[in-house]
Amino acid sequence: MTLVTAGGAWTGPGCWHEVKDEESSSEQSISIAVSHVNTSKAGLPAQTALPCDICGPILKDILHLDEHQGTHHGLKLHTCGACGRQFWFSANLHQYQKCYSIEQPLRRDKSEASIVKNCTVSKEPHPSEKPFTCKEEQKNFQATLGGCQQKAIHSKRKTHRSTESGDAFHGEQMHYKCSECGKAFSRKDTLVQHQRIHSGEKPYECSECGKAFSRKATLVQHQRIHTGERPYECSECGKTFSRKDNLTQHKRIHTGEMPYKCNECGKYFSHHSNLIVHQRVHNGARPYKCSDCGKVFRHKSTLVQHESIHTGENPYDCSDCGKSFGHKYTLIKHQRIHTESKPFECIECGKFFSRSSDYIAHQRVHTGERPFVCSKCGKDFIRTSHLVRHQRVHTGERPYECSECGKAYSLSSHLNRHQKVHTAGRL
């Protein structure tokens, strides 16, 4: 790639040569030429992290976002008329071109772009030069698009300040200001909708159940509970959802994406709610309190299970024999008596399994394969569940909580053993 200014041309890292061109000198502009469509990411403008509207993951910049979106099917290429770079989405092309319109528009005329020349003077490395100076911070930058990136940083700061003060934002005047909190809006209907946060007004009522909402979009989303409408379908497995965010979360099962990281132990999670629950291991929070005895719990499900002690309720009924249970996991364990079949046979030892995953994991006993390795200590395991269980040694996580007393354990077997203390006391 070659950059040309009034003073010279940049043809590679640290490569700067004088180019005599009257048009270039008079207009004091920058022209850009890219010799190949698939230009590398080095030296190209970088933006802040951007989310994929199709499946949810957050990418570090517009180029990584567009590369990721190319994995989705049925998308057409959009080409930048100035440099030839191709994008899967037109919106990404526009975002890419914005970088050049911060101060100087990107040239599109072919005759003007013809002044760009390749460096043929010498193949030897030249002393690194930094001909561009940032007016905001007096920092020097090499003759790369990094200067453009720096301008974008300051542009964002100015935009943020402009938004806070109620000035124009992207050409819109922020005429409508909230009298409660001072937040400004460009449209009156947006202000009216915002003010319902303060007033508590909920004008949109569900005709089926009477539940009210502050936004019409939320009512439409709620009504799908009654209509059974599930318009968002997973392209991988065909499962449908009533909400787009639920589909986005579900897709992480297929992609393996885990965008939420715990700052304490570095563990990753696919759902933000799972991260919040996990962080209670570190901060000791127990937000769920029993109204009968005052005991507190880390998980809402544990509180619900605990409350059955006071009510004597056994809400989980077996559809096969009618037996009822106080806990859902106890019902699931019981139902295996009625439903379990074992179609998967190991040809090595003749053992049968009800699930293919158990069969595959069992075969590793014979092959010696241990594909799941702990990144902390290097210990390897046959099953991913065994690795997850082992990692609690390093993280200190104790996800199994006693519904009687709130004591937590790292293994379900330890919780079961502990709960016998309570059941023995009631006999």
Swiss-Prot record:
Stored InterPro entries: Krueppel_C2H2_ZnFinger, Znf_C2H2_sf, Znf_C2H2_type
Single biological process term from Gene Ontology: regulation of cytokine production
Molecular function via GO: DNA-binding transcription repressor activity, RNA polymerase II-specific; RNA polymerase II cis-regulatory region sequence-specific DNA binding; zinc ion binding
Keywords, in A-Z order: DNA-binding, Isopeptide bond, Metal-binding, Nucleus, Repeat, Transcription, Transcription regulation, Ubl conjugation, Zinc, Zinc-finger
Record-linked Pfam families: zf-C2H2
Localization per record: Nucleus
PANTHER family registered for this protein in UniProt: IP01015P-RELATED (PTHR24377)
Function (record text): May be involved in transcriptional regulation.
Annotated protein name in UniProt: Zinc finger protein 134
Organism: Homo sapiens (Human)
Gene: ZNF134
